[in-house]
Amino acid sequence: MAASPVLAVDNSSVAADQLKSIIERIERLEEEKAGLAGDIKDVYAEAKANGFDTKVLRKIISIRKRDHEERQEEEAILELYMQALGMV
């Protein structure tokens, strides 16, 4: 049984409305993300102005994001490799 033209238009309209809503939400979130990125940049600039090494700060943040066990395993492997190379 074929869909009636009215039903097809309604479905198309609903899909278009949903698509528009999704696109607008993504655009709004992208704007927020850009704003947050600017805020983060400002905090790093403040840290640098106060004498902190921003590369080290970024590394610490990266480390804190990871699971404790995963971090310990990576540190153990790093230590092993450094010993093998006579670096410690």
Curated annotation (Swiss-Prot):
GO molecular-function terms, A-Z: DNA binding
Domain of life: Bacteria
Any one Pfam family match given in the protein's UniProt record, by short name: GapR_DNA-bd
Disulfide bridge partners, by residue number: none
Family: Belongs to the UPF0335 family.
HAMAP family reported in the protein's UniProt record: UPF0335
Protein name: UPF0335 protein M446_5200
Source organism: Methylobacterium sp. (strain 4-46)
